[in-house]
A protein has these predicted regions:
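N-terminal amphipathic/basic-hydrophobic helices that include classical n-h-c signal peptides
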Residues: 1-16
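Juxtamembrane helix-loop boundaries in multi-pass membrane proteins
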Residues: 17-42, 61, 83-108, 125-128, ...
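Helix-coil boundary and interhelical linker segments in multi-pass alpha-helical membrane proteins
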Residues: 43-57, 111-123, 169-183, 231-242, ...
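Membrane helical hairpin/interfacial module
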Residues: 52-120
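Structural signature of hydrophobic alpha-helical transmembrane segments
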Residues: 59-70, 119-133, 180-193, 240-251, ...
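A generic, well-ordered mixed alpha/beta core segment in the N-terminal half of proteins
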Residues: 107, 111-143
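Alpha-helical transmembrane segments in multipass membrane proteins, preferentially the mid-helix core
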Residues: 138, 171-172, 195-204, 226-235, ...
Length: 330
């Protein structure tokens, strides 16, 4: 259905361009291939325990890659025919952060492709790494000039350009064998997270998010677990004290978000809930390392199952929205 809708956009581009309708695919929707790709990588690490884990990983990886290709094509179309929308998004104090999802998903899809074609994988990972670094250098540095920063800039998506993107670069470079370089990106993401976290949480304490933006609260779950997964990729899966500390803080954030979930979905379930997916998938990924290391094995099994069930529910919500014609913006 998504492919047919995409084809229809091309057939009716003149009519679309003559209206003020928004582009049907928000950049935040890249959270869908992001979550699926990260979950595929988690299942891939279970290959030695379950014979069917590789098959599950491959299916998830193929679906994630297909969705990513579709969204990349749609975004390329947006650049060509909706360039003013792209410009407005880049300069928006909140939405600009979602652009970082493009290089992040490029790296994750590259991680998946590594099992089949290491050369293409390495090219994609380097494109994503250079792309995210270039984007954050250009856009985040603008906030230091004064006069272009707004308080609402420090919302959960603000984690994406400097924190999530650097953690993803770290784990992807570790896959290619560049561990020392990966530690540099891990350090960049970790320090950026430590600096941004109190600012963002203070903003949430003094001003409430509007209902349409509340689903982005799920992004708060990501830094601790994505950081833990990145670190485990760099240190060859050793569950040391730092990983346990990151897990502890990640679960604290999870408990807070579970308490807030009725408020987050007060106006109904929406595609923005995929903001939880990266954190959930990384939680599952790191849980496998805990299980392999004979650390909190009972907890790790529960965490892996919980993460998969939650992402499965996100998939069902997405399918429901597609069947009801409520997926794309109108």
């Amino acid at each position: 259905m998504a492919v047919l809708h995409f084809a229809q956009i091309f057939q009716n581009k003149d009519n679309i361009m003559s209206t003020t309708k928004p582009f049907p695919l928000p950049t935040g929707y890249f959270g869908i291939p992001l979550g699926l790709a990260a979950l595929s990588l988690a299942w891939f690490h279970l290959e030695n325990l379950f014979p069917t884990a590789r098959t599950v990983s491959d299916v998830l990886g193929i679906v994630a890659s297909a969705v990513w290709i579709l969204f990349i094509l749609m975004y390329a179309y947006k650049l060509r025919y909706y360039f003013e929308d792209v410009r407005a998004e880049y300069h928006c104090p909140v939405r600009f952060s979602f652009i970082a999802l493009i290089p992040i998903t490029t790296m994750l899809v590259g991680d998946i492709i590594y099992r089949w074609n290491p050369l293409i994988s390495e090219v994609m990972i380097w494109i994503g790494t250079v792309g995210q670094l270039l984007f954050s250098s250009l856009r985040i540095s603008e906030l230091w000039q004064g006069g272009v920063f707004e308080q609402k800039s420090t919302r959960p998506p603000f984690y994406l350009p400097a924190v999530a993107a650097n953690f993803t670069s770290a784990s992807s470079l570790a896959l290619l064998g560049y561990h020392d370089l990966g530690y540099l990106f891990f350090g960049a993401g970790m320090v950026a997270w430590i600096i941004f976290e109190p600012v963002l949480l203070q903003h949430l304490r003094i001003s409430s998010l509007e209902p349409p933006f509340r689903a982005t609260m799920g992004i708060i779950l990501a830094p601790a677990f994505v950081g833990a997964s990145a670190y485990l990729s760099l240190n060859h899966g050793e569950v040391d004290t730092l990983v346990k500390i990151l897990w502890g803080y990640g679960f604290l954030q999870l408990f807070f978000l579970l308490r807030l979930f009725p408020w987050i979905v007060e106006k109904g379930l929406n595609i923005g809930l995929w903001g939880f997916a990266f954190g959930l998938a990384s939680m599952a990924n790191s849980a496998i390392a805990f299980y392999h290391g004979n650390v909190l094995q009972g907890v790790s099994i529960f965490v892996f199952v919980f993460s998969n069930v939650m992402i499965g529910l996100l998939v069902l919500i997405t399918i429901y929205k597609l069947t009801k014609g409520q997926f794309f913006l109108k």
